[in-house]
């Protein structure tokens, strides 16, 4: 089995469906004897350029271990899901389990915002 990192850009109006989407993709991987090593919800970010007349998207990151057939099935699901604006799959040498650089930045910004709210109150 191979290790993959998948980054998804989801339509911002479909943000409430993100947990269900993640659960569906995790179920696909585990049903095919694969493993899910890391799932990160990075939140909404500004896009570098407009995609389908949208300036923002909801970002997700999955690190999985599965066969290439399972990956093909997952990517086919991305293509037929209108909520997925873009996806990128990268083959990794080993499983990534720690927080990604983007997730560290998101957590740092959330901590900064909460400390500012505490000092303002």
Swiss-Prot record:
Keyword Ribonucleoprotein applies: yes
Record field: transmembrane: none
One of the GO BP terms on file: translation
Domain of life: Bacteria
Biased composition (Basic and acidic residues): 104-115
UniProt cross-references to Pfam families, sorted A to Z: Ribosomal_S6
Gene Ontology molecular-function annotations: small ribosomal subunit rRNA binding; structural constituent of ribosome
Annotated spans, Disordered: 94-121
Keyword terms, alphabetized: Ribonucleoprotein, Ribosomal protein, RNA-binding, rRNA-binding
Chain's role: Binds together with bS18 to 16S ribosomal RNA.
HAMAP family in alphabetical order: Ribosomal_bS6
UniProt name for this protein: Small ribosomal subunit protein bS6
This protein's encoding gene: rpsF
